[in-house]
From Swiss-Prot:
The gene is Akt3. Residues 406-479 form the AGC-kinase C-terminal domain. AKT3 is one of 3 closely related serine/threonine-protein kinases (AKT1, AKT2 and AKT3) called the AKT kinase, and which regulate many processes including metabolism, proliferation, cell survival, growth and angiogenesis. This is mediated through serine and/or threonine phosphorylation of a range of downstream substrates. Over 100 substrate candidates have been reported so far, but for most of them, no isoform specificity has been reported. AKT3 is the least studied AKT isoform. It plays an important role in brain development and is crucial for the viability of malignant glioma cells. Residues 148-405 form the Protein kinase domain. This is RAC-gamma serine/threonine-protein kinase.
Length: 479
């Protein structure tokens, strides 16, 4: 590939994602799609640490005159999350120059990717998603909504719902995430959805939720995922108030193992919190993200402060600095602090005060905590991501070597050879005692599958189908 060059550079005002002030940043747009910002104009274009660094590949651009004239918004992907970044410049001409340059780079990258996909459908793991998976469904009959019994509602969000289902043919239980296409397409979430599908397909780790099938109907996308019914860690912790250090060490080790795996594949999870940590029926961790807790992105005019849980935000995310893998180690610090101390390390109902605590306040520990536990949590909750435990080039290995985890055999962790400290009291795979009663008490309302023909595609209007090419997938093609 040819050398990466600068397409455009200059000063722009960037709006904070969480703390909504404007900051001057010197941005460079490069041919590889990177859009990187610095506090000062860099003397050397290969400076190692830009404050802001994201890709304009597959981005969408919007122009608006609010909250300031000559504003433009870039909406793009960070793993499975759609993010928006807001900029403004002094003149309409300047804005036009930036948006045209960004669009041109994004279009060229799109063409290059299409050419690559046509040339080598299965040569890279990143591209397995659509080609190989679609091929696999030619040997295994494509799944439809008729293939499942719909048992209980497990969760609900902006884009759809998660339902406990039973596969008729095998009798196995799964969690099916059903997304309405109109909602996703209306909110420009197609890229997000397809990326999430590809990430799930390529993910194989004992402590990460795996995808069994994905398919589409006329108006829905369906992900059929591994189902674990041991309940959210949040549920168990709120019942017991605190976990012992041994129990926390067990869960912490399984989380570190999973994050190490993701990071080795250049994926930052970014959303670690108790609600996304579940237990399987044996008491092992499963990191899930049914993608329903994110409340979507509002339009540019309303600029909702944030989606997600502010208590878990790392300082570098709050300050709109570039962030990488170390953001996950901050998240690990917060969840392990909660487990051992029974409360969040930083909390205030007033979000402005909460942000100030996250950025400025030192953490305090209960006297009962061991020195190893204090040392681990202090290291994980260092404000500067470059100084944080795990923030160096060794990433997870740095945490694995910490004295808190001494005596842990990491291969045994991965192989599930360690005995879980708690076994959920579930009587069967359909036992949903650990799920939120608000959901499990509801009756399930989805359009009856009989309304679809066997393919589930009959009468598909040409308006919607092209957004989701080759979406079907069956894991059995790989096993």
């Amino acid at each position: 590939m040819s050398d990466v060059t600068i397409v455009k550079e200059g000063w722009v005002q960037k709006r904070g994602e969480y703390i909504k002030n404007w900051r001057p940043r010197y941005f460079l747009l490069k041919t590889d799609g990177s859009f990187i910002g610095y506090k000062e104009k860099p003397q050397d274009v290969d400076l190692p640490y830009p404050l802001n660094n994201f890709s304009v590949a597959k981005c969408q651009l919007m122009k608006t005159e609010r909250p300031k004239p000559n504003t433009f918004i870039i909406r793009c992907l960070q793993w499975t999350t759609v993010i928006e970044r807001t900029f403004h410049v002094d003149t309409p001409e300047e804005r036009e120059e930036w948006t045209e340059a960004i669009q041109a780079v994004a279009d060229r990258l799109q063409r290059q990717e299409e050419e690559r996909m046509n040339c080598s459908p299965t040569s890279q793991i990143d591209n397995i998603g659509e080609e190989e998976m679609d091929a696999s469904t030619t040997h295994h009959k494509r799944k439809t909504m008729n293939d499942f019994d719909y048992l209980k509602l497990l969760g609900k969000g902006t884009f759809g719902k998660v339902i406990l289902v039973r596969e008729k043919a095998s009798g196995k239980y799964y969690a099916m995430k059903i997304l309405k296409k109109e909602v996703i397409i209306a909110k420009d979430e197609v890229a997000h959805t397809l990326t999430e599908s590809r990430v799930l397909k390529n993910t194989r780790h004992p402590f990460l939720t795996s995808l069994k099938y994905s398919f589409q109907t006329k108006d829905r996308l369906c992900f059929v995922m591994e189902y674990v019914n041991g309940g959210e860690l949040f549920f168990h912790l709120s019942r017991e108030r605190v976990f012992s250090e041994d129990r926390t060490r067990f869960y912490g080790a399984e989380i570190v193992s999973a994050l190490d795996y993701l990071h080795s594949g250049k994926i930052v999870y970014r959303d670690l919190k108790l609600e996304n940590l579940m237990l399987d029926k044996d008491g092992h961790i499963k990191i899930t993200d049914f993608g329903l807790c994110k409340e979507g992105i509002t339009d540019a005019a309303t600029m909702k402060t944030f989606c997600g849980t502010p208590e878990y935000l790392a300082p570098e995310v709050l300050e709109d600095n570039d962030y990488g893998r170390a953001v996950d180690w901050w998240g690990l610090g917060v969840v392990m602090y909660e487990m051992m101390c029974g409360r969040l390390p930083f909390y205030n109902q007033d979000h402005e005060k909460l942000f100030e605590l996250i950025l400025m306040e030192d953490i305090k520990f209960p006297r009962t905590l061991s020195s190893d536990a204090k040392s681990l949590l202090s290291g994980l909750l260092i404000k500067d991501p470059n100084k944080r435990l795990g923030g160096g080039p060794d990433d997870a290995k740095e945490i694995m070597r910490h004295s808190f985890f001494s005596g842990v055999n990491w291969q045994d962790v991965y192989d599930k050879k360690l005995v879980p400290p708690f076994k959920p009291q579930v009587t069967s795979e359909t036992d949903t005692r650990y799920f939120d009663e608000e959901f499990t008490a509801q009756t399930i309302t989805i359009t009856p599958p009989e309304k679809y023909d066997d393919d589930g595609m009959d009468g598909m209007d040409n308006e919607r189908r092209p957004h989701f090419p080759q979406f079907s997938y069956s894991a059995s093609g790989r096993e």
